Amino acid sequence: MYTLGIETSCDETAAAVLRDATVLSNIVSSQTKIHEKYGGVVPELASREHLKNLLPVVREALAQASVGVKQLDLVAATHAPGLIGALLVGVSAAKAIAFSGKIPFIGVHHGEAHILAAQIEHPDIGYPYIALLVSGGHTALYHVQEFGSYRMLGQTRDDAAGEAYDKVAKLLDLPYPGGPVIDRLAQEGSSSAIALPRGMQEGFDFSFSGLKTAVRTHVALFRSKDAGLDPKLNRKDVSASFQAAVVDTLVEKTVHAAKETGTKTIVIAGGVAANSSLRKRMREAAEKHGIRLVLPSMQYCIDNAAMVALTGYLHHKRGERSRLDLNPRPSMAL
């Protein structure tokens, strides 16, 4: 069967076509350049860009897959959580395609799509596994017991990890998005140059606000109202020290969750899963503890529609479908 997936939860306009669980096309149009000058995603601009780009992206996905609208057996779209205006664009388009072609429609939870994304390239993952969902809007640990059964073990109490990266990048006068920039600078810095805290060491919840405050306090020593940021501040060392603190926390809690639940497989999902230090450290920790680590390739870490199509396809196989009066929701627990 052919599934069209649509993703517009934040600032990526994406469409993909799958034949069963095989990706035939996966198109992503990023808005990063548009939001860069504002230091973050502007919801109104994001919605307008989705309106402008979605149909061309859908057409490209269908053309690349050599699939016509009349051949589609299912349309799936992210309906929660995310920016409400952005979600509305994708959900409305998906429902229109479904209604006009009398095609089943399924609304997909963005978080569920992320924690299933690794199955695109690794269909043999099996269950159960521990999923670390880590991105600009989410940081949470799930015990994925089987498809459709996800037990949250812990989540962030304040900033998501990706959000903390963006805020620290702003403190250092670095461009948005901050994650890739800090990751790159960190490779040339010393991770032990600055003593930074590791938040909420007990349990499975996360906290990055204390870490962010510690970085702000350090950077403030090198900033003046008149001259701005002092060139003596070593941004590479700050980046490396900050990244080490984040990665230490993510790795330790994820491995602890696997050991606590007796789970032998870990999956990392979300945009921050593309971070080079996180991938390296998690590989080392997994090998040390005899745990299988499954890492999606970069194209399936970022927001994409292939993971949405896969999730919709799996729900459809269970006989599920959504009503056409389904509304997008800005927040929704998994």
Regions found by a protein language model. Give the residues of each.
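Short Gly/Thr/Asp-enriched flexible loops that form oxyanion-binding sites at enzyme active sites
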Residues: 77-102, 120, 276-284
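N-terminal beta-alpha supersecondary unit
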Residues: 2-81, 110, 238
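Short beta-strand scaffold segments in enzyme catalytic cores
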Residues: 13-18, 131-133, 139-143
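Glycine-rich phosphate-binding/hydrolytic loop that grips phosphoryl groups
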Residues: 115-116, 296-334
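Conserved phosphate-binding/catalytic loops in two-lobed NTP-binding clefts
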Residues: 107-108, 283-307
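Glycine-rich phosphate-binding loop plus the immediately following alpha-helix
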Residues: 123, 145-188, 212-213, 217-223
